[in-house]
């Protein structure tokens, strides 16, 4: 059964593609509509309980709070793991800015949790070729952004013994055999149907999807998974990513059996919303929509106080009388992503929604938390030398 459904809907109510996220006018992203449209499955409480049983750890708050909310074949990955069979994690980053922002932390933070919980290898694809094709930047700029972004990623604490980070511009010859096999299985009509490409688009856009698909297959990494391993065709892949990346992997799942591999499994996150509201995601293309890991404490304070959309009352009196609408309040939404303490979050939600907490108070809590995360990350990043970066990106055997 094919999984290649169009990425955008015909009613133009919301547009969700790997390059554009826009909710219906006046609304927020409808995630259940995406689940129906893409054909994925909502993560159930039973699956979370199974996850905890297999790992022996409490589920990450991203799972408990429904931030990672949808999946393809996650149950099969847990079965695979319990059977002692090999699998690996794959995620990526398109380097389009000199620093990661908080939206980028979402998949990487969860991926690190998965690596630690399951003790499995991880490959991270840096799609500097994609950004060159889609953005107004030079190849030299994309290479520079890659270098800076990789240091940001390493500083999150990934295990150097189990992590391989690669740049497409440098590693493409290793991916190319699988890129060719994938490209032969997908025709022009399918690519246009999945991604919405137009005749006026550069041909590089049409040829890129197989490049993002190739790391799903273990023989793209013979230094990690030897080609003479009799089980190589049974090694599975789990991809933590935002749900806008799903079209790439629907395509990949459709053709996996034709090139002798297992379908990649996915676990999808919601978007980290822009400061201005839930209608789109935090984006490096709009600096006013994002808080960066390179921002100063004053910049963080200024962005949250000036730009974070509030669901609170317009005056102190209104807030005390009616409380805040948490469903539209960006400050509270950010805390659901970043504040790990469930009881503290519950207390904030109660006090803010009932008017016992003012907008300025909750924004200050967020400012302090964001600055704490940024300072901790800057300290870790300062220890990432070029030598450490080179090791993470070197072609070598991993220990797992």
Swiss-Prot record:
Annotated compartments: Cytoplasm
Disulfide pattern: none
Chain ranges passing through the membrane: none
Enzyme Commission number(s) from the entry: 6.1.1.2
UniProt keyword list: Aminoacyl-tRNA synthetase, ATP-binding, Cytoplasm, Ligase, Nucleotide-binding, Protein biosynthesis
Source organism, top-level taxon: Eukaryota
Gene Ontology CC terms: cytoplasm
GO BP terms: tryptophanyl-tRNA aminoacylation
InterPro entries: aa-tRNA-synth_Ic, Rossmann-like_a/b/a_fold, Trp-tRNA-ligase
UniProt KW Secreted keyword: no
Residue span of motif 'HIGH' region: 95-104
Membership in a protein family: Belongs to the class-I aminoacyl-tRNA synthetase family.
Full protein name: Tryptophan--tRNA ligase, cytoplasmic
Species per Swiss-Prot/TrEMBL record: Dictyostelium discoideum (Social amoeba)
GN (gene name): trpS
